[in-house]
Swiss-Prot record:
It comes from the Bacteria. This is UPF0145 protein STH1265. It holds the Pfam family YbjQ_1. Coiled coil: none annotated. Belongs to the UPF0145 family. PANTHER family: UPF0145 PROTEIN YBJQ (PTHR34068:SF1). InterPro entries: UPF0145_dom_sf, UPF0145_YbjQ-like. Gene3D superfamilies: Hypothetical protein apc22750. Chain B (3.30.110.70). It comes from Symbiobacterium thermophilum (strain DSM 24528 / JCM 14929 / IAM 14863 / T).
Length: 104
């Protein structure tokens, strides 16, 4: 399945808009404690553990987005937007949304 942040798929026409699809992933209460414990992972100014958790949340959301679009009979999800938000003091929420479409 094609998943893109653009509003269309180059070289293909959108035959039908099937609706908005969305997914959420929440990283649990130990996320920030684990992050603080792994600050030693800083390599070249980057926190490897933090990036790993963000990537894990993003990948989970995209998997769910594709699954929801497939249930609708979509060929692609266009206009994908991914957001990150801290919830409370101890959780991170990753959300993804887009429009499921059928292509010609």
């Amino acid at each position: 399945m094609i998943v893109t942040t653009t509003p269309s798929v180059e070289g293909r026409q959108i035959a039908e808009y099937l609706g908005i699809v969305s997914a959420e992933a929440i990283m649990g209460a130990n996320f920030f404690r684990d992050l603080a414990a792994s600050i030693t992972d800083l390599i070249g100014g980057r926190a490897g553990s933090y990036e790993s958790k963000l990537r894990e949340g993003r990948e989970e959301c995209l998997r769910e987005l594709v699954a929801e679009a497939a249930r609708l009979g979509a060929d692609a999800v266009v206009g994908v937007d991914i957001d990150y938000e801290v919830v409370g003091e101890s959780m991170l929420m990753v959300t993804a949304s887009g429009t499921a479409v059928r292509l010609r």
